[in-house]
Design a protein with these regions (language model features):
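C-terminal ends and interior cores of transmembrane alpha-helices
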Residues: 87-103, 286-301
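C-terminal transmembrane helical hairpin of 12-TM major facilitator-type secondary transporters
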Residues: 278-323
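Cytoplasmic helix-loop-helix junction between adjacent transmembrane helices
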Residues: 113-152
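A late C-terminal transmembrane helix in Major Facilitator Superfamily
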Residues: 332, 336-367
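Helix-loop boundary and gating motifs at the non-cytosolic
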Residues: 2-63, 209-254
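Helix-to-loop junctions at the C-terminal end of transmembrane segments
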Residues: 64-78, 167, 262-277, 364
């Protein structure tokens, strides 16, 4: 079993532990806000349709605003940009809370939640710091990227659970309130660690990341992979509901995230062979193959516990795939525009999640929850086809006729 000493060496870097602690605190609410908003709005207004529409509007607004926020971070620095942007987002959350609490018109909910779109990409800023601190050390950067992906999975695994606990145990607005406080506190702790912040350039030369060679195909892969995540979540909720065990859906999805988290930490402790461009198709192929397990478990057994095991195993392909993708984004993004490049990748994922959720929901409603598990498999196959479009990867060469 690989030793985890690379992580110890990572956090021996001066300032690494401090900025990581603040960033994790700021990142945890990312898994809380959506669930908190749905529980708060649906509980007060009695409409899940309204709650879903409000959160979908916020997701769309984030897709539009996030790249601009990231561009400002690259241009003016993390501390000067992220903190004001976070204050605006926190005020948006507070406004949403007050509008729901005082029975304000529905349009105020949409406007308030849209304001939270200024939330900076905290994970991207942390990765940018690692890229700055570990410049020239590809092995250490691989470990750092793996840790960041595991942290993402952990936050998105614990966030919904914490949100549901707060809203259900205390009062419906508790999840939104605590999330806003954590976001603001974590961002303050993170941005005040100036010693590890990447330097700011008055003028950033080169093309925008969207025009950089190799970035658009990666964004297309991210879009397809987002479809995997969005469809899997919706279909699993529907499958558990059809079994009469809707309350267990969160645990089942948490197991998938746990599998990815463990795989990410193990992946970061080893030194994978070959360039990232050659590894990506293999990672996506593994994801596509393992996603067949939930489909088979649902179709052949109809057992929720077996489905949970299948999702746990399938989740183990997620982190290596995402780590490799983000490594390629870092390699291909023009110098000085790393936050923008990684935020574009996240935006692609969010767009895919929205599409996957819609297609997965339609499939479960018009066919069956079991048939819905074909959607993430199809999305993964599309991601594989897109990743194979690069003629430079070894996967393509292996399949080519001699």
């Amino acid at each position: 079993m690989p030793q985890l000493s690379p992580y110890r060496r990572l956090f021996e870097i001066p300032g690494a532990r401090a900025f990581t602690a603040g960033n994790l605190l700021a990142r945890l609410p990312m898994g809380m806000f959506s669930v908190s908003a749905v529980m708060m709005i649906a509980g007060a207004r009695g409409s899940y349709a309204l709650a879903g529409a409000v959160t979908a509007t916020g997701l769309a607004a984030t897709g539009l605003v996030a790249p601009w926020t990231a561009r400002l971070v690259d241009r003016h620095g993390q501390a000067r940009t992220a903190l004001p942007a976070t204050v605006i987002a926190a005020l948006g959350s507070l406004s949403l809370l007050l509008c729901v609490r005082h029975d304000a018109p529905d349009w105020t909910l949409f406007a308030s939640y849209a304001a939270t779109a200024t939330t900076p990409n905290t994970g991207g800023m942390s990765r940018a710091r690692w890229a700055h601190l570990l410049a020239g050390d590809a092995k250490a950067l691989h470990t750092a990227n793996s840790f960041e992906q595991a942290a993402d999975e952990l936050c998105f695994m614990l966030g919904p659970v914490l949100a549901a606990f707060l809203c259900g145990t205390f009062f419906p607005e508790a999840g939104t309130l605590v999330g806003a406080v954590l976001l603001l506190t974590g961002t303050v702790l993170f941005t005040t660690r100036r010693a590890t912040e990447p330097p700011v350039r008055a003028h950033i030369p080169g093309k925008a990341p969207l025009r950089a060679p190799g970035i658009p195909p990666l964004l297309a892969v991210c879009l397809a992979m987002g479809g995997v995540f969005g469809a899997t979540e919706v279909v699993t909720l529907a499958f558990a509901d059809a079994q009469g065990r809707q309350s267990a859906a969160g645990i089942v999805l948490a197991l998938q995230a746990a599998g990815s988290c463990v795989a990410g930490l193990l992946y970061g402790a080893v030194n994978p062979a070959g360039p990232a461009a050659a590894r990506l198709p293999w990672c996506v192929a593994a994801m596509a193959a393992l996603l067949a397990l939930p489909l088979l478990a649902a179709a052949l057994t109809g057992s929720l516990p077996l489905l949970a095991v299948a999702l746990l195993v399938a989740g183990m392909a997620t982190a290596p795939t995402m780590v490799t993708t983000m490594t390629l984004v870092q390699e291909r993004t023009p110098e000085g525009r790393l936050n923008e490049g990684m935020t574009l990748a996240v935006t692609g994922l969010l767009g895919g999640i929205a599409c996957g959720s819609a297609i997965g929901g339609w499939t479960t409603e018009h066919l069956s929850p079991t048939a819905g598990y074909a959607v993430p498999v199809t999305a993964a196959a599309v991601a594989l086809a897109l990743s194979l479009r690069s003629p430079s990867n070894r996967f393509t060469k292996c399949l080519a006729p001699h």
